[in-house]
Design a protein with these regions (language model features):
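Active-site beta3 strand of CheY-like receiver
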Residues: 59-66
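A Lys-centered signature of the CheY-like receiver
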Residues: 138
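Helix N-cap/capping motif at the beta->alpha junctions
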Residues: 22, 44-53, 76
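Conserved acidic segment of CheY-like receiver
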Residues: 13-35, 65
Length: 166
């Protein structure tokens, strides 16, 4: 089993994560795993509407959002568009079980796209000014969660101090 590097736990403790996914079982598994890894606060939302409201009403603004793409009511792409309009500065990771085969749902924003959906979603979100670091295909495992957190923590780490030459 993959374990995070010991320095990572201090960095994980600074994360305030918003998980947005319509799969309640996955939300619970991710919440337990994040808590086990030392993440300080975890907010859950079952669809894009809940995610947007949770983000807007949070006492401590999430600094990491992990968002599914295909959800009922308000999907991930629409959620990301609203977050961009709100000026969201959080780090964002996109997850989906529908990377190469879109779901049969004409209401889903990317239902008719013929190609890797995760790559397209990343590009669209970045064009809107969001800080998307990567996307991950489901299933989401403990190892993928550690990879996700390490990616964000490494990106946000201060640059190493440069020692002056003598």
């Amino acid at each position: 089993m993959m374990t995070p590097n010991p320095d990572a736990n201090a960095a994980y403790a600074k994360l305030h994560v918003l998980l947005v996914d319509d799969d309640e079982f996955l939300l619970e598994i991710m919440k337990v795993t994040l808590r086990d890894l030392g993440v300080s606060s975890i907010l859950l939302a079952k669809n894009g509407f809940e995610g947007l409201n949770t983000f807007r009403q949070a006492t401590i603004r999430p600094n990491l959002i992990i968002c599914d793409l295909c959800m009922p009511q308000l999907g991930g792409m629409e959620l990301l568009s609203h977050l961009a309009l709100d000026g969201c500065k959080a780090d964002i990771l996109i997850i989906s079980g529908h990377n190469l085969i879109p779901p049969v749902d004409n209401h889903w924003a990317l239902a008719n796209y013929n190609g890797p959906i995760l790559n397209l979603a990343e590009k669209i979100a970045r064009i809107q000014g969001l800080k998307v670091h990567a996307s991950f295909e489901k299933p989401i495992t403990r190892e993928k969660i550690i990879e996700m957190l390490d990616l964000v923590v490494t990106f946000n780490a201060p640059p190493p101090a440069i020692q002056a030459s003598k």
